[in-house]
Amino acid sequence: MRIVFDIGGSVLVPEDPDIDFIKAIAYELVKISEDHEVAVVVGGGKVARKYIQAAKEFTLNETFKDYIGIHITRANAMLLIAALGEKAYPFVVQDFRKAWEVIQLKKIPIMGGTHPGHTTDAVAALLAEYLQADLLVVVTNVDGVYDSDPKKNPNAKKLDRITVDQLVEIAMQEESKAGGSGVVDALAAKFIQRGKIKTYIVGKKDAYHLFDVIKGKHSGTVVEP
């Protein structure tokens, strides 16, 4: 299989880098890459949001602030490259064609953000579409897709299996709310829909066992194309 992993920045670096987690997923990714083609996109998470918030004191330029976030995602990506060692391509990959070339070299391409206005979820979905991946695995700080925000609603129900059309609907509903924070943003959901990409959305606990996740053994949400 060809698999794209979308690792949330807040999972990798919640406040400070989670060294044990980074070691664990690096081990899992190397193991998976022995039998499958693997590409990874890393997010900026809380650290990126802090920098972007600070930048608001100095500039109203949204594109400039997006670039700040992109640089943070690439710093996180470099951390994972270091953890993966020789199995990873030694530089942060910045475009999809290069990711394809790296895969042909039997290495793991690691990407961060690419363009202003695109989240790393959107980048991962586009990369999966470009590579014609068999599977997209989204690792987030929520253990799947819920029918409402579980941080605000203790009775929120996790959805074990949904269609991509449902994912788009849920993402758009969350995005329309003030402060809404769905597990996947609406643009990424639409790219998943367009690319007809089978997607697993899992939490940090499952991410310690990515080798099992790709076999469908997880407690997250399956998104059917």
From Swiss-Prot:
It comes from the Archaea. UMP binds at residues 44, 66, 114-120. ATP binds at residues 9-10, 45, 49, 140-141, 146, 149. GO terms for cellular component: cytoplasm. One of its GO terms (molecular function) is ATP binding. Keywords: ATP-binding, Cytoplasm, Kinase, Nucleotide-binding, Pyrimidine biosynthesis, Transferase. One of its GO terms (biological process) is 'de novo' CTP biosynthetic process. It catalyses: UMP + ATP = UDP + ADP. Pathway: Pyrimidine metabolism; CTP biosynthesis via de novo pathway; UDP from UMP (UMPK route): step 1/1. SUPFAM superfamilies: Carbamate kinase-like (SSF53633). It is found in: Cytoplasm. Its EC number is 2.7.4.22. Inhibited by UTP. Homohexamer. NCBIfam families: pyrH_arch (TIGR02076). Belongs to the UMP kinase family. Catalyzes the reversible phosphorylation of UMP to UDP. This is Uridylate kinase. It comes from Thermococcus kodakarensis (strain ATCC BAA-918 / JCM 12380 / KOD1).
